Each structure stands twice: as C-alpha cells, then as structure tokens.
Amino acid sequence: HLFPLFQPAEAGFYYLYDGKEYHRMYIKAGDEIHFQGIDGDWKQVDITGEENRLLEQWKEMKRSLKMDARTEAYGAYFPRFDSLRLEVDRWLQETVVRDSLFQKQLKETIEFDLLYDFISYIAKNQQSYESEEQRSAYYRQLIGRFPVEDGRILQQPYGIQLLREYFNYKRTFVIRQGEYSFDDWLA
C-alpha cells in the first residue's frame, strides 16, 4: 500500500513510527512524502526535497553501525563507530544546504542519533566496567560532557530512552566505582 502523508502547518522534522522504528522526514508545505509497506517494513518512496535526500544518506551511513552479536566481538563496534564519526564530520562539512536552519537541525539530529546508538549499544552489551568502550575517543569525550540538561534530547523520539539508558549505565558501571554526590552522578 502506498499512502500520502499530511501537509504540515510549518516545516520541520516529523516522525512515523511503525511499531519497530521511527522514520524521520523533513516536511514543508508542498512536499509530497509517500511511504510503502514492503514485507512488514515501511520505506519512504519517491523521496523529494534536498532535505529528505540528505536524511536518507544519513540513514544509509548509520547502517554501518549495525552489529551481529552472534558473530562479532563487543569491542568491534567502537573502531567502527569512531570511523563513522570521522566520515560524518567530513560529510557534514562538505554538505551545503540552502536552508541554514535545516542544516543546523541535521547536524544536531545526527549528533543525537550517534549518541543514542552508542549509549544503547553499551547498555545492551557491556558486561564489565573495564571494557573496550573506554578506548573509544567518543566515549572519553562523552563521559565528561553528556548533554543531560540539553532539552533538545527530548525533541528526539528516543529522548527518554536515551536518558534512561545513560543513567542506568552510569549507575551500573561508573557510580559504583566510588563515592559520588548527586551532582557528580548527573555530570
């Protein structure tokens, strides 16, 4: 089945949830966005607009982070993640969009997507505190400055889940290593 989506009152990011994942799209007046159900999965078809083509490129880049836990070691994720971060940074620098607000939102959205993927991976797979993620450049940067007070996290469809997984990780693997005040715990 192919169906058109509504026309929004204002341009911005919109999400369609199919029960498994969120499909992100950027819709502005006059855009026609169509989704088609294929074997139980929804796929955006007839991608229109520069913004949606860039979102689709990002979605394809992000696929490289998918791991097969049965055949790949836990630590194999982190070099792959750090490599994708470098690739994304280059891609964002080279990508020029006419809509500067969208360009800013794209960068923020990608940062939060990477953060969510990283924290989710650790939360699901880490077995001990002394673990491979600590060798990741992103991990070292993240632990010192997690954006817990950044309201933009809650603008993402996974915002609450991201905060929950981060605090569970800190409580399980970081806080128990020493005495911390509540403020230290939040930092």
Language model: regions and residue ranges:
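Short coil/turn connectors between adjacent alpha-helices in alpha-solenoid helical repeat scaffolds
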Residues: 75, 79, 120-131, 174-176
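Residues that form generic nucleotide/phosphate-binding pockets
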Residues: 87, 91, 113, 141-145, ...
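Short, mixed-charge aromatic SLiMs
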Residues: 132-152
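Long, charge-rich alpha-helical interaction segments
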Residues: 149-187
